[in-house]
């Protein structure tokens, strides 16, 4: 296992990871290399579960994979590409070895300590037109021209199920997110996500930078990589340093989705930030704001791999990364729940959101003020953000139930309710009626 130390553009041998299959799942064992431990600038890859020390670290969680290794592994999309192009690996470790180039964070892997990971160049924006058809074909199980391997193979390690490709220009790396055959044909997911980035920024929430482009009739969302920094070499070419990354799942030491349970907990994550964050007070407040925002906009896919932390410049601690993967989900039942536990449960009600505000170092009054401000900002701006992202009036009406009703709608509903009470001859409480209580 290799790591890119702060500012470095080449990996340093960090240690050895073995994963053995067992009847119960798997056992993972990791040992830091003595050469790594002897370096004054060595950094722990997980300060909680893998502190810098000699000796063996072991785990049986997640089939014997430490969370930081799961974060660096390909997800549904990448695994599917690897299976299609190279055949299914004999073990999950094979996915770590066969995915190259674009994995999130600063870890990398090879088969032996004297064989550094392959550093493949990334394609530029000029491949995007061809990529629309290529990735659509891969999603349908069609193998592509072997000549395209040089830009498909380095793009298998990023998480999620959507077709994607990491590209690079002279200044930044971008994660290009493509349409999926599973998308609603009437709504552009790229435009939806771009609109929510803008809406979150209206609410004072830090988000990833994104750019919406159209290529060959397809909407693509380019998301700037927050874990890569361009470094100019002496020959004028661009190399890339890499920053460490951990998901909320790793911070929470969770094994992921379990039947009849939530995929993480916002209050629990806030409490764990004390050990992980370089600035826990600021990160807890930001996390609370994101929790409120996700509840208010019906982003119910806010599971613990859709929140991340990136190492600070010195690699000494972590900070919340910019918010990402936010899309409203049209409710299908009257009872709405978030993927992560919000307060006492996962319901996105104001009372529940405020029920564990002390975990975020906030008073009830402070938490209530943040909630009400975000709700009002969303109510006032969501249609404008949809419009600026090129979403139609029909799309707005389709997703209107995801957002707080306008004040006009609230007042109209109140008037209708009041009239119904009068017409029904309700003899109950006189509160709220002319001349009443």
Regions found by a protein language model. Name each.
Residues 1-304, 308-437:
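Phosphate/dinucleotide-binding and metal-coordinating scaffold of catalytic cores
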């Amino acid at each position: 296992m290799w790591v890119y130390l702060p500012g470095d553009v080449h990996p340093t041998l960090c240690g050895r990871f073995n994963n053995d299959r067992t009847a119960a799942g798997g056992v993972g064992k990791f040992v830091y290399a003595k050469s790594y431990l002897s370096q004054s600038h060595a950094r722990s890859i997980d300060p909680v579960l893998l502190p810098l020390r000699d000796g063996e670290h072991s785990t049986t969680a997640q089939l014997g994979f430490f969370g930081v290794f799961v974060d660096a592994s390909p997800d549904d999309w990448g695994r599917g590409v690897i299976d299609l192009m190279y055949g299914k690996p004999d073990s999950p470790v094979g996915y770590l070895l066969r995915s190259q180039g674009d994995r999130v964070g600063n870890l990398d892997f090879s088969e032996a300590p004297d064989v550094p990971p392959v550093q493949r160049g990334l394609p530029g924006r000029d491949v995007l037109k061809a990529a629309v058809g290529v990735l659509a074909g891969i999603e349908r199980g069609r193998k592509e021209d072997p000549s395209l391997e040089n830009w498909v193979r380095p793009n298998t390690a990023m998480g999620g199920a959507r077709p994607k490709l990491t590209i690079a220009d002279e200044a930044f790396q971008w994660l290009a997110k493509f349409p999926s055959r599973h998308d609603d044909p009437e709504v552009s997911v790229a435009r939806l996500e771009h609109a929510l980035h803008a809406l979150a920024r209206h609410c004072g929430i830090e988000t990833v930078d994104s750019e919406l482009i159209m290529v060959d009739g397809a909407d693509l969302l380019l998301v700037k990589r927050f874990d890569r920094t361009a470094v100019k070499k002496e020959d004028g070419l661009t190399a890339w340093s890499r920053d460490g990354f951990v998901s909320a799942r790793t911070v929470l030491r969770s094994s992921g989705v379990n039947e009849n349970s939530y995929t993480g907990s916002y209050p629990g994550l806030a409490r764990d930030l004390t050990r992980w964050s370089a600035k826990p007070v600021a990160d807890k407040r930001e996390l609370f704001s994101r929790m409120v925002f996700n509840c208010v906009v019906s982003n119910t896919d806010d599971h613990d791999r859709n929140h991340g932390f990136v190492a600070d410049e010195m690699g000494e601690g972590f900070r919340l990364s910019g918010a990402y993967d936010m899309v409203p989900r049209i409710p299908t039942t009257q009872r709405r729940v978030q993927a992560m536990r919000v307060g006492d449960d996962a319901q996105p009600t104001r009372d529940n959101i405020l029920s564990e505000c002390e975990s975020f170092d906030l008073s009830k009054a402070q938490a209530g003020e943040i909630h009400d401000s975000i709700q009002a900002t969303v109510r006032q701006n969501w249609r404008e953000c949809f419009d600026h992202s090129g979403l139609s009036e029909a799309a707005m009406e389709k997703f209107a139930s995801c957002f707080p009703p306008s004040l006009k709608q609230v007042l109209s509903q109140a008037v209708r309710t009041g009239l119904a009470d009068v017409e029904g001859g309700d003899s109950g409480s006189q509160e709220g009626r002319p001349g009443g209580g």
